[in-house]
């Protein structure tokens, strides 16, 4: 929550949102949160979690982040008659989010997703990663374009778990 720098007026996209844990937490301090997840049951759970907790400022979409976000962005640009050149002068709630949070699988973010995030040009991107190699790869892309790494914090996401595998025959 601290990394997102929310004050209550921000519009946030949460990509790879799962059951909405981060989305619903962020909704406490955001104007609106939009979550995207590929697993339909996870989105149903996110919607149920929002309802159970009386959260009304979170919306959830089923699909791959690398498909949903670009499709939404292109459709919204047409609807709002915004071009890439003029889009940076003003924000619209969903088209120009203040913050994008990503918590991708180990493979990291898809290139199309990263490109769309860059086009949407949020003030902040919060990247949660379970793979340091794909984190480094994706940060390189984001930082080469327009962002600067301001804060980072390492923590063990999988307590007492080791990412090694043993194969036996």
Which ranges hold each PLM region?
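Rossmann-like S-adenosyl-L-methionine
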Residues: 1-169
